Design a protein with these regions (language model features):
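Glycine-rich phosphate-binding loop signature in dinucleotide/nucleotide-binding domains
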Residues: 1-7
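Glycine/threonine-rich flexible loop motifs
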Residues: 18-27
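Glycine-rich phosphate/pyrophosphate-binding loops
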Residues: 37-59
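A short, flexible beta-alpha/helix-coil linker loop
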Residues: 16-19, 50-51
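Electrostatically charged, flexible surface regions
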Residues: 58-171
Length: 171
């Protein structure tokens, strides 16, 4: 499609609802950006932390500013930037901050929350429940909850680096 005129940056989103922490694994928005990055294109996934807001103007403005920054600060092939914008007016957003840690997803505490679209479709989302104390203070979820637009660098490589026991399987 774009063989001779590839984009300088692929922006996936703006997603309705956050893509923070372990939820990134399930996100079509994040994974569309991941596909672009694996094809060698710089990519940015953008999400608004609201399932009900219809005003994307603040998220769009912040996405544009982060996109301009991302073009000047490229990541290696196979990596992407993941932006999450709080659902706040611009004058209440504290700024844009890098989040080195993704909030963990504790499936033992998880629950499903439902959301009904304007077309009366019901969607279910796996959430971490009501346990923000379990998240590190500098994690994407905590920073975003406090009013920061957060940017995380993600990679497709989710391999466990340490802790896998030696394979001893007889055939």
């Amino acid at each position: 499609l774009l063989r001779n005129d590839a984009p300088d940056l692929v922006i996936s989103g703006i997603n309705r609802g956050p893509n923070l922490g372990g939820a990134c694994i399930y996100s079509g928005t994040v994974n569309a950006a991941m596909e672009a990055s694996m094809a060698g294109r710089p990519a940015l996934a953008a999400s608004l932390r609201s399932f009900t807001s219809s005003d994307y103007s603040v998220a769009a403005e912040i996405t544009l500013r982060v996109a301009e920054w991302a073009l000047k600060n490229p990541l290696p092939r196979g990596a992407l930037y993941n932006l999450n914008v709080p659902d706040l007016p611009m004058d209440r957003i504290l700024g844009v901050r890098g989040a080195q840690k993704l909030a963990p997803m504790f499936l033992s505490d998880a629950r499903y929350e439902s959301f009904q679209s304007e077309y009366k479709h019901t969607f279910y989302f796996l959430t971490d429940g009501e346990n923000p104390h379990a998240f590190p203070e500098d994690s994407d979820d905590v920073l975003n909850e406090r009013g920061w637009a957060t940017v995380s660098a993600l990679s497709w490589d989710i391999s466990l680096r340490q802790g896998m026991p030696p394979i001893d399987v007889k055939l």
